[in-house]
Amino acid sequence: MLKRKRIVAYLKRAPSDIRKLFREPLLLIGIILVNVFLFLFIVLPLFKIFQLSFEVNGQFSLGVFVDVLSKRYNVQPLIHSLNLGVAVSILSTVIGFIFAYAVTRVDIPWKRFFSVTATFPIIAPPFMMSLSAILLFGKQGFVSKMILQNLIEFKIYGFYGLLVVETLTYFSTAYLTLYGVLQAIDPALEDAALDLGASKGKVFRSITLPLATPGIASAILLVFSQSLADFGNPMILAGNYTILATQAYLTIVGMYDMKGGAALAILLLIPSLIAFCLQKYWVSRKSYVTVTGKPSTTRIKMDHPVTKFSIFGLCLVLAGIIFLFYGMVFFGSLVKLWGANHSLTINNYKHVFTVGWEFIKDTLILSSIATPIAGILAMIIAFLVVRKNFPGKRLMELVSLLTFAVPGTVVGIGYILAFNQPPLVLTGTAAIIILLFIFRDLAVGVQTGIAELQQIDPSIEEASTDLGADSSHTFRKITLPLITPAFYSGLAFTFVKCMTAISAVIFVVSGKWNLITIAILGSVENSDLSQAAAFSVVIIVFILLALWLIQFLVNQIGGGRKIKFEKAEALQSR
C-alpha cells in the first residue's frame, strides 16, 4: 500500500518536473547533452567490453571465460591481484591510521610535517616508488651495491616489492579518510569516559576505535580498489608475480587476443565493483560522525611519555622512509648513468627538455585542455543532481560516479573497443586521450561539487530564480562563484591525475600524441633509470607549479580562500 502511494505521488510530480524543463530549454538541452556524454564515454565503453566477452558468433556465450580461466597463466594473476590487494589495503590502513591518530590525538611536534608527508604521494606518479625501489635495492642500487656491496640480495621483484611500493603509494588515501573520521568524533564522548575514570588507553579501545571502525573499513576497501587498479608499479616490479591489470594489457598487446583481454578486464572489474558497492552503500551508511555543531570541549591528547614518543618515533621513521624513496629519485636524476657511471650531471634534464620535450608538451597540452572541461562538466552535473528535479536524476549521478569503481585498465580497453570503429573513430587522435582524461576522474569533481552544494543554502539561488533568472544564468552568476573552492579543487585533482595517468591511456596513445608517463615506463624498460628519474622530477615540478597557479587564481577570484586538493582525494571515501 505504501509503495502504491509513493508511485502515485511520483506520477503526480513527474509531469510538473517535465513541464518545468520545457519552460527552460537551455536546462533541458543541458540535461540531454550531459546524459549523452555520460552514455557515450562511460557506459558505452563498458558495454563494449561486456559485449565482446559474452558474445560468440552473435550469441550469448561463456565460452571466452571458460577458455580464459582454463589457462593457469590467467588464473594466477587473479589470485595474485586479490592477495596483493588485501595485504596492501590492510598495511596501508594501519600506517594511515597511525599518521591520522598522531596528527589528531597525540601531543607530538611536527604535525604539519607529518600531514604533508602523508599526502605527498598524491601528486607523484604512482609508479615513482617502484623506480625508487630499483634505485635503492636493485642489483646496482644505492643500498644494495654502494653501501652493502651486494652482501644482501633484496627481492624487490614480486609480491614483497609490490607490497612495499603500493603501501607507500596508497597509504595517503587511508590517511585522508581516517583523518576526517577522527576529526568528526565528538571529543565530549571521550571526555565523558575520562571523567568516569577510564584511562586514555581504555578510551581509545572503547570509544575512539569503535567509532572509527566504519572509516577504517572504508579505507581498506578504497585502498583495495586502488591496488587492484594499479598498473605502473606491477609493470616495473611484478617480475614473475603477474597481476590481472598487466596480464589484460599483455594479452591484448602481446598476444593480440582482444576477447581474452576483455574477459580479464571483467574479472578485474568484478572485485572492484564489489568493493565500491560495499564502501558506498554499506560502510557509508554506518555513521561514525558524532559532531553536529561546534564541539564544546577540547580534543583529548595522548600525552603519556611512552605513548607520545613511541608514536612520534614511528611517524618519524615512516616519514624518513618516504623521503628516502622520493629523495633517491631526485638523486638518481642527477647521476650520469645509473649502475655504470655515478658522476653528477644535469645531462638527464637536458635530454628531458630536448629529446623528451615532445612528451612533456603533449602531456601539458592534453591535460590543460581536459582539466577545465572536466571541472565545468563536473560542476554542471553536481548542480543538476543537487538543485534540480528531473526524471533520471539518480541514474545520472550513479553513472557519473561509476568511474570510482572502474580500474583504468578496464576503461582503456573499453575506449579502444568503442572508438576504433564507425560511427565514432577516435583512435590515434588527441580527442580520445582528452575524452579519457575528462571522464576517467570526473567522479571526483562531481562528488566535490555535490558536497559543496549541500552546504550552501538553496534560498540564495531561489532568490535569483524569483527575480526572473533562468537556471543557466543562476548557475553562472550565483552557484559557480559560491562553489569556487570546490571547482578549483576539482581542477587541481584532475590536472594531477592527467599528468600522472598510465593505466588507461597506455591503450590509446599513438605516435602522434604521447605522454610523459609512457616515456618514464619506456626508460625503465630500457634500464635508463636516470632519465626515468629526471622525467619523474619534472612531472612533480610541473604539478606543483600548476597547483600554485590554481591557488593564485583562487586568491584572485575567491577572496583568498584556500583550495583543498586533499579534500578532493578524500571525498572518494564518501
Model-inferred region functions:
Residues 1-33, 280-316, 551-574:
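Transmembrane alpha-helical segments of polytopic membrane transport and secretion proteins
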Residues 7-11, 53-63, 136-149, 237-245, ...:
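Peri-membrane helix termini and adjoining interfacial loops of integral membrane proteins
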Residues 23-58, 70-183, 209-232, 263-280, ...:
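Membrane-water interface segments at the C-terminal ends of transmembrane alpha-helices
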Residues 231-255, 340-341, 502-529, 562-570:
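Glycine-rich helix-loop "coupling/hinge" segments at transmembrane-helix boundaries
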Residues 246-271:
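Helix-loop-helix hairpin linking two adjacent transmembrane segments in secondary transporters
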